[in-house]
Amino acid sequence: MKNNQSKIKLVIDVGNSYLKIGVFHDLELIELKKFKTKYFKISYFENFYKKVFAKYKFNLFIVFGSVVPSIEQKFLDFVKENNLENNFFLINNYLKLSFKVPQEKLGLIGNDLLGAMEYASKETSNALIFLFGTASVALLLEKLNFSGAIIAPGMNFSFNNLLSKAKKLKGFKLHKENVSLWNLNTQDALESGYENLKNGFIKQIICKSNSNYPVYISGGDISNLSPEISHQFVDNIVLKGYLLIYLKNC
């Protein structure tokens, strides 16, 4: 691992909803591929791997992080079958990080949360980090310590579940544009509900945290985020954090 000279890294983030593969040249994300996790087959990755290898003519190094054990095992089998052990790095709770995790919590924290925290800790000692995906997550970084998390059902997941159970809402899609607070029809009322859930989740946590820490947001749709919320949007923060964890340990 220490002698790996490949400039091209395939960084893989396996989440509950999506599996993302980022192609990085040094620290720059130059290509992104995304699959729905529930339908993923290892042959999809094998084909993508071959295409990237043919395109960039570099030995490829794989950085892998997952919150789905069954998918992780498929990749471990692929690596073993193709003799790629020396070009593979597995994210876990026991690696060197740029922030501290309580000893008693090691092994209990999702790898995706570690990735997001690593990214933020490279920029600041204190931060509030919000991740919007299958779950809505808030993370607290204080003095380069992982101080806690809040996890709620993901908003897209919750709304899709609502829509699936309401017969009159079949085919409805959230547009999330120019949303008024109060509305007189179901579609606009749902749009408002979605936006207020999102803004309320963020604003309430910032308020209760009683801090002026920098706010990082990743995932989901933030097109109508309240202008009162000063924040930095970081696309694919987990992928970028996984790469930083690898670089700290190589």
From Swiss-Prot:
Q: Which domain of life is it from?
A: Bacteria
Residues annotated as catalytic:
D112 (proton acceptor)
* EC identifiers of the protein: 2.7.1.33
User: Which amino acid positions bind ATP, per UniProt?
Assistant: D13, V14, G15, N16, S17, Y18, L19, K20, T134
Could you name the Gene Ontology cellular component terms for this entry?
cytoplasm
Q: Which GO terms describe its biological process?
A: coenzyme A biosynthetic process
Instruction: Describe how the cofactor binds.
Output: A monovalent cation. Ammonium or potassium.
Q: Where the protein is mainly located, per its record?
A: cytoplasm
Q: Where does substrate bind?
A: G110, N111, D112, L113, T186
Q: In which pathway does it act?
A: Cofactor biosynthesis; coenzyme A biosynthesis; CoA from (R)-pantothenate: step 1/5
Q: Which InterPro entries match?
A: ATPase_NBD, Type_III_PanK
Against NCBIfam families, the record matches this protein to:
baf
User: What is this protein's function per UniProt?
Assistant: Catalyzes the phosphorylation of pantothenate (Pan), the first step in CoA biosynthesis.
Describe its partners and assembly state: Homodimer.
Q: What's the name of the protein? A: Type III pantothenate kinase
This protein's species is: Mycoplasmopsis synoviae (strain 53)
Name of the gene encoding the protein in the UniProt record = coaX
